[in-house]
Amino acid sequence: MMNIRTLKLTNLGRFEELDVHLAPVEEFKSNVTVFIGNNGAGKTSILKSLATSLSWFVARVRTEKGNGSLIPEDAILNGRSSATIELQVLNTHPATEAATPYRWLLARTASGKKSTTASSLQEASQLAAFYRDQYTQNSGASFPL
């Protein structure tokens, strides 16, 4: 089972820096995270960023070197040279119940700007390889939704 623990956005959408801790968290043991805000507050930016980051995991489950969606250039915060999405997940092994953390970072630099951050997708690839191995051994294996 895979649980998304944190999502960090830097210079993306309207956020200079945003850390979102998804349920469950220490204070609240609920399994539900709710985003509430006025129009234009950034709820859609958060969800699109989550989908963009997870698209790399899904693509690498399908094929070893698969490519997911890129951060759109127009999503980079005005006046900034780059934007990043960092995702941290916790994957629990079905047989051993051992929980392993994984983290990956997706970066986008604006055209004509110097790159300051690079994407780091090694752990997304490792997690995808784990699920490909599980599926190879058992075609009825479960995948995270």
Predicted regions and their residues:
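Extended helical coiled-coil dimerization/tether regions that scaffold
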Residues: 1-3, 88-90, 145
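A broad, low-specificity signal marking well-ordered, structured residues that form hydrophobic/aromatic
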Residues: 7, 33, 83-85, 144
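Glutamate identity and glutamate-enriched acidic tracts
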Residues: 16-17, 27, 64, 73-74, ...
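Glycine-rich phosphate-binding loops of NTPases
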Residues: 95-145
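Intrinsically disordered, low-complexity boundary segments flanking structured domains
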Residues: 4-9, 43, 71-75, 126-140
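Short linear motifs at secondary-structure transitions and domain/linker junctions
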Residues: 9-12, 30, 58-65, 115-134
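Pre-Walker A-like glycine/lysine-rich segment at the N-terminus of P-loop NTPase domains
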Residues: 1-51
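Conserved P-loop NTP-binding catalytic core
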Residues: 47-116
